[in-house]
From Swiss-Prot:
PROSITE patterns: PDXT_SNO_1, PDXT_SNO_2. The active site is at C83, H172, E174. This is Pyridoxal 5'-phosphate synthase subunit PdxT. The gene is pdxT. Pfam families: SNO (PF01174). One of its GO terms (biological process) is pyridoxal phosphate biosynthetic process. It comes from Thermoplasma acidophilum (strain ATCC 25905 / DSM 1728 / JCM 9062 / NBRC 15155 / AMRC-C165). Pathway: Cofactor biosynthesis; pyridoxal 5'-phosphate biosynthesis.
Length: 203
């Protein structure tokens, strides 16, 4: 099982580190920095990390990955998108500078939680996982969750949603040290639906 992390910008290494922690019990797991279409062709799943959404968008266009990711998703490739990654895979970004891929039927408002100095961490309850420490950094807000399945909310707003083979969240699970969401994604890749036994997961 080869999981790729889109490697242009943002929390690329942090996602890699979380997956490496899980490789001890997933010995078939290999990791790839995805920067070219040929890289994408060799992965079974993709993580699109947080960072700066306009920069990531421009680079996916420049390197031909935008359309390639949409195509692979339509073919069933699982995708995990965090913060800026969620903006990229959304249906409506509310930002003319970033054309969403339409992989999640959500409407997004960028930087809705304020500037970086106003970032925060709080516990949220996620279906299939339980209480989880969520780190919000200039996070977007999901204004309309459309046809997605809402897995968790904060103050009545969805913060993590799933639709088919794509899961997206407004926060940064890679910054917590808690590997459960990455294990959830690995189980999605394995076709187990994502749900995990929290008793089996070491934080």
């Amino acid at each position: 099982m080869n999981i790729g992390v889109l490697g242009f910008q943002g929390d690329v290494q942090e996602h890699m580190d979380m997956l490496k922690k899980l490789s001890r019990k997933n010995r078939d797991l290999t990791l790839t920095h995805v920067k070219r279409v040929i890289d994408l062709e060799h992965v079974d799943a993709l993580i699109i990390p947080g960072g700066e959404s306009t920069t990531i968008y421009k680079l996916t266009l420049e390197y031909g990955l935008y359309d390639a990711i949409v195509k692979r998703s339509a073919e069933g490739m699982p995708i995990m998108a965090t913060c800026a990654g969620l903006i990229l895979v959304s249906k409506n970004t509310n930002d003319e500078r970033v054309r969403g891929m339409g992989l999640l039927d959500v409407t997004i408002r960028r930087n809705a939680y304020g500037r970086q100095v106003m970032s925060f961490e709080t516990d949220i309850e996620i279906n299939g996982i339980g209480m989880f420490p969520a780190v919000f950094i200039r996070a977007p807000v999901i204004e309309d969750s459309g046809k997605t399945e809402v897995l968790g909310t904060l103050d009545g707003k969805p913060v993590i949603v799933k639709q088919g083979n794509v899961i997206g969240m407004t926060f940064h699970p890679e910054l917590t040290g808690d590997t459960r969401l990455h294990e959830y994604f690995i189980n999605m890749v394995r076709g187990r639906g994502g749900y995990i036994s929290t008793a089996d997961v070491k934080r």
